[in-house]
Regions:
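Sequence-level preference for short, compositionally simple segments enriched
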Residues: 26-327
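Bacterial N-terminal signal peptides
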Residues: 7-19
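Sec/Tat signal peptide C-region and signal peptidase I cleavage site
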Residues: 21-25
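Positively charged n-region of N-terminal signal peptides that target proteins for export
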Residues: 1-6
Length: 327
């Protein structure tokens, strides 16, 4: 009888240890949900105030919910704001806006990198249902979104600007975009990070270049666009898919609908003659009036079905598979 009781006690203890959530996980001891509302109904009226109130390097994810409104502020997610999500009520009416640009900042040759409306330095960041815009206009470099963190996710967002709208920094950083809208003029998606764009609309507002990847030597992938719509404003006459900001740039368009008037050659070199030998530009199964594979420049590539099949989010993002990318 005593043996049976001891066995029962041990079994119950084992079950409790395995299946009971520790109190620290149920209540981490810090606030994990915040609301920002301009009418005062939330915890804060400004986004930056909410970010500054969060715990540094939290064990549990933190969510800041943004009520509808136009938030005119420069927002910075610091490196210690890891596992942070900013979730808007809806994309069209939840807007973060600012109007800095190169000459206004006036901090020397690198002023571009200070012009952001939203800058993300932290890892494991998520933005959803939000518009981020730089309203400086056609006055030179003016960044809307600047990302330096790793494993950053953007779902159902809009990024609006002119030159240099989206800057994806970090030589080993990985970013994932799904169902997003991005517009701009010159080089409006640029940087050295690895990024996957799924089912996004990419809209050129002038005759210019869509991408300017600066992939570093030795990195296997740069920007990959999958099943995206490439569109243009009505008065646009010619758009290039990209040009290499650095000589090892890598950009691929997979099964994209090229509705914009893409230049027949598709891609263009920068000033460096070595670009043609070291850059990797490719397409697979492009559709629409801008798809002219036989007229593309000789140093670009048309992928085979087998080659294209090797391009998956998990492979491109080196084993990181964000929830938004899962079927």
């Amino acid at each position: 009888m005593l043996y049976n009781r001891l066995f029962l006690v041990c079994a119950i203890s084992f079950w409790i240890a395995c299946f009971t959530v520790p109190a620290s996980a149920q209540n981490p001891g810090y606030q994990t949900e915040f609301t920002v509302a301009q009418d005062g109904s939330g915890d804060f009226t400004r986004i930056q105030e909410a970010i500054d109130a969060t715990k540094a390097f939290p064990d549990e994810p933190i969510t800041i919910r943004l009520k509808k409104g136009v938030y005119k502020e420069k927002v910075r997610v610091y490196s210690w704001n890891t596992k942070l999500s900013l979730i808007g009520e809806d994309r069209e009416n939840t807007v973060i806006t600012y109007d800095d640009y190169f000459d206004k900042i006036n901090l020397g040759r690198n002023s571009t990198f200070h012009t952001y409306t939203l800058q993300v330095e932290a890892n494991d960041f998520r933005l959803e249902n939000v518009t981020v815009e730089n309203t400086a206009g056609p006055v030179g470099q003016a960044v809307a979104l600047h990302v330096e963190g790793d494993r950053c996710v953007f779902v159902n967002c809009a990024f609006k600007g002119n030159q240099d709208t989206v800057y994806l920094a970090g030589e080993r950083s990985r970013d994932y975009f799904r169902n997003c809208y991005i517009d701009g003029t010159t080089d409006f998606i640029f940087g050295e990070a690895t990024a996957w764009f799924e089912a996004c609309e990419i809209r050129a507002k002038s005759d210019s270049y869509i991408t300017a990847a600066s992939t570093v030597e030795g990195r296997p992938y740069g920007f990959v666009f999958h099943e995206c719509d490439i569109t243009a404003a009505p008065d646009v006459k010619q758009v290039y898919l990209g040009r290499p900001w650095r000589q090892f740039a890598r950009t691929v368009f997979l099964e994209c609908n090229l509705q914009a008037p893409i230049a027949p050659e598709g891609w263009k070199a920068w000033s460096n003659k070595d670009d043609k030998q070291t850059t990797f530009y490719a397409e697979y199964a492009s559709q629409g009036p801008g798809a002219q594979p036989k007229q593309r420049i000789a140093w670009s590539h048309q992928l085979s079905k087998a080659d294209a099949a090797a391009y998956t989010p998990e492979k491109i993002l080196e084993g990181w598979m964000p929830e938004a990318a899962k079927p």
